[in-house]
Amino acid sequence: MKKFIVVLLFIACKSPKNEWVSLIKNNSLDGWHYFQDNGLKKGWNVENGILIFDKISGLESGEDDASLLSDKIYESFEISFEWKIEKGGNSGFMWGVDEDMAYKFPYQTGPEIQIIDPQVYAKPEDVLGGDIELNNVLGDLDQKKKYLGAVYDLFSPKGELKPNPVGDWNQYYIKIDQKNNKGLLKLNDVVINEFPLSGPEWDDSFLKSKFNKSEDYPYLGEKRWYDFAKFKKGAICLQDHPGKAYFKNIKIRELY
């Protein structure tokens, strides 16, 4: 009987961690904050349960990054959310983000699952964000490591993607399993990317990416990309980037 009670107590202690939790609460930004928030940043709001980014991006304005970070720190998890962007728009989901003031941007530490209007690969001139984003697309037309569903500049999506049109809702399901070194992405219930989180395959992709060329990016400051993907535990992040972006039905579940 004593052993049975101990087992029940163990299950009771573990179960809350394994439940799906909504990340949009009270129709507000409760549970979220701006990257390195100084009380002056703006651009995100919640309307009717929809999380909205609606401002000129920091990339375009030169203002400090206003990406949105979770208050809670995560390690291994699965997350599901619906998203939509405007024509030519660009956003992203990051994990493992560290908020030390030594970093100027969340993407200095956090890998990114790319969200972008895929039609800009057919008409690059339609991409929002000026020459920087235009050159990103033009330099990636073949490899598609910055395409919709890519782990940005590391792993291209697989197979034929079938996103809903720009302006309609799409769904991402993302699993980050640090314990088993596995990442997975589904677009509208179809697996489009599977990738490691460390190890030889990751290292090989990293060596070929811009993240291995820190000296070419002095605007990042002293830390550059030296700590990229080094933090297994970190905040999750929705990116401040060109174009309006909308997110709803954001749910997360810790794996362990």
Question: Across the structure, where does each feature detected by a protein language model lie?
Answer:
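Carbohydrate-interacting regions of secretory-pathway proteins
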Residues: C13-Y256
